[in-house]
Each structure stands twice: as structure tokens, then as C-alpha cells.
Amino acid sequence: TEGPGVVSIRIAGLRLDRLHARPGQFFQWRFLNRWWTAHPFSLSEAPDGSSFRITVKALGDDSAALSRVPIGTRVIAEGPFGVFTDAMRRGRKRLLIAGGIGITPVRALVEHLADDVVVYRAIRADELVLRGELDALGVDVHYVVGDHGVPGGDRLLSPEHLIELVPDLADRDVYVCGPPGMIDFAVKNVRAAGVHRRHIHVERFAL
């Protein structure tokens, strides 16, 4: 497991390299032991051609059941989907903003680029998923933990706070993934901090 209610699953198969999956993309997954409905999950590790890894938080009965999926379960994967990839980058440097389990595609994206900065937002420290891996990769990560409802909490991820964390923010491409409300909040504030709309890339798992 990767944290409370969070589990990583590795899916192996033949000729997976032919799918040309890229870090930051997602698939629609069907686990045939019980799931006939597809669920979108991002790759949480850069694909190596022989396996994929996803990291899932228990947000409902289906995702909670993934922690009990037997080894050897057959899987149907449709994809890859999404443009939350390095190909969208217009400049040399990136800021990647993640909220909660939205860290999964960000974790896959940051394996090879030294100029990346990550801002990882959570209400509580135990909601920070894959923190050990991010630290082991040597990524420049700012963990922003706290509730907007407490005194001083309204400053978290404000334009001023973002510029304080990343002084060259306006010169970076910004990638955002997380809950819908957090995405909208972050996009509004990075725009206010001087980032052009064309340099903002969002993953909403839309098909």
C-alpha cells in the first residue's frame, strides 16, 4: 500500500511497448474478477514496455475492491488517453501542481527532468501519496498541507503563495491534476500569477 486507502497495482503483459503509452497518460481499466465497468486511472510510473503501474485511492466500492484483486487477474485496458504529457510543454521548465491522488500522473512525469518543481496539495499529511518515491527521486517538491477553512488557510496556493514557492512561475509551463474544485482554484491563481493560458495543462480524465 502507498498510504491509507491507497494501493498500487502492477499490470504485466506482452508487447505493451506497442501501445506507445507516455508518462502522464491514463487508461480505462476493467479488472475481470469483478469489474465490467471501466474506470480511468493514470499510470503512476513511467512505462517500461513490459508493465504498467497504477495507484488507486478507495473512493467507492469498486476502487476499494482493488486492494483485494488476486495476482493473475485478467485485465482489459483501453487507451492510452490524455494529453497530460511532456509533449504539451512549450518551454524548458515545468511546475506540476497535484491535489491528493492527482499526484499519480505527476509522479510518472517527473522521473527524468531535473528542472521540474512539484507543488503537492493535501488537507492532511496522511493524504500525501507516493511521498517516499518523490523524495527518493530527488524532485523539488513543496508539500502544501492544511485546510482553507482555518485562520490563514485562505493563503494556501494563492497567487502570492505560488510565487513565493516558485519565483519563476510565470516562465514555466504549469500542469494541474486533482479534484475538480482544486483544479479550478489552481488554474485561476496561476493565471493571476502571470502564467498564460496556453502554458496551463490540465488532466480531467475527459474522453
Segments (PLM) and residue ranges:
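FNR/FR-type flavoprotein reductase catalytic core
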Residues: 53, 58-207
